[in-house]
Amino acid sequence: AMGTEIQKYNLTEEDFRGDRFRDVPGMMKGNNDMLNITRPDVISDIYRRYLEAGADIITANTFSCQRISQADYHLEDCAREMAFEGARLARIECDKFSTPDKPRFVAGDVGPTNKTCSMSPDVSDPAAREITYDELFTDVCEQVDGLIEGGADARL
């Protein structure tokens, strides 16, 4: 999958940060979605290799491109941009390989978040929630909007 492919590049903390996120606190390595912004060459290369191998549909590198997950990295304000760029890069590569007889498609990846609105994080307070349904809905809608604007044909 995408994470395994990214690991093959042996990227450094500096690769993940790029110049733009140099001063953001905390570790960024492992936040694969930010590579849509900081290392689009790597992400595009991965997409291209899937298409060269014969893929008809490629999954965009957008699994955690919502504010909820990106808040752990202090990048919640970049979540929509990450989703957009992940889909846009995939769309560019798919368009290079598409033909009238064999179109290629982009599936925007909408992964789960690291917070849930269905279970309490506190065993002594079963009604407690880390996030509300409305917050979750709003964040996922923002991610999906970025995917659509970036050119995704479908959402996973």
Regions found by a protein language model. Give the residues of each.
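Domain-level signal for soluble alpha/beta catalytic cores
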Residues: 1-156
